[in-house]
Amino acid sequence: MFIRILGSAAGGGFPQWNCNCANCAGLRAGTLNAKARTQSSIAISDNGVDWILCNASPDIRAQLESFPALQPARAPRDTAIGAIVLLDSQIDHTTGLLTLREGCPHEVWCTEMVHQDLTTGFPLFNMLEHWNGGLKWNPIALSGNFSIPCCPNLHITPIPLRSSAPPYSPHRNDPHPGDNIGLLIEDRNTGGTLFYAPGLGQVSEELLATMRRADCLLVDGTLWRDDEMLVREVGTKLGSEMGHLQQSGPGGMIEVLDGMPAVRKILIHINNTNPILDEDSVEREILGEHGIEVAYDGMNIEL
């Protein structure tokens, strides 16, 4: 299995256009040892030729241009993207579908709840239906697994996660299974297994059992501490209120990952305020001591 990190930041990217926190200001000034990052999205493939896009970031055009494998140029109009899988209906995971409209029709895989949001509160399916057939919905059931024709050797198991629908959703305050999912992806040729969950707010015993099956964990790295947005004076909500498990402290992501046998443990969807973006920070050093990596745009993983 080939995995390309197209974008590794949380919503807004890094630096965020209107943010002057220490990280964003430091990166702009050239005083911070850090890499700029676009909003999170990955591409996966079983052969390195045909690819599945997992989430469609607002930064998708720049991300596609940065990865030549996604433009094989076999015809006057071409793409190596054979399908798109949406893990949720968040704006920063779906807005890129608008940028991809010239390539319609697209095969889009998502749950019933995500499809509801994207035909009501943020009606992308409706908006794009006049673009050469628009978005073709392939339902993701919350039980069993599925494969996608362009990458038939990748068997994908959806994992329902405990989190909320986006703020715009008609059922924002009425959570349903399928609002957010993680993916357990197994390459039947190599046996390599990836667990991908860029938005992870709570970890149940059942989820821990699933995570233990993976060779590589690519999981939520949004915030170092739950009150990070408040401490940095750039927000009013706790990470837990936004559906993100902090890295530090009892029950945090570091503690969760310490109990995992995976060969690689990688954080993705990193908020611009997170001190782990500073490669010289104490927090980054702590991650290294625990064998935890930090995803960056352009990172390649092979399983």
From Swiss-Prot:
Assigned keywords, A-Z: PQQ biosynthesis, Transport
Biological process terms in GO annotation: pyrroloquinoline quinone biosynthetic process
Q: InterPro entries recorded for this chain?
A: Metallo-B-lactamas, PQQ_synth_PqqB, RibonucZ/Hydroxyglut_hydro
Q: Determine the domain of life of the protein's source.
A: Bacteria
Q: Note the SUPFAM superfamilies from the entry.
A: Metallo-hydrolase/oxidoreductase
* Annotated pathway: Cofactor biosynthesis; pyrroloquinoline quinone biosynthesis
Does Transport count among this protein's keywords? yes
Membrane-spanning regions, if any?
Answer: none
Read off the Pfam families from this record. Lactamase_B_2
- Briefly state the protein's biological role: May be involved in the transport of PQQ or its precursor to the periplasm.
What does the sequence similarity comment in the record state about its family?
A: Belongs to the PqqB family.
What protein name does the entry list?
Coenzyme PQQ synthesis protein B
Q: What is the lineage of its organism?
A: Bacteria, Pseudomonadati, Pseudomonadota, Gammaproteobacteria, Pseudomonadales
What's the gene?
A: pqqB
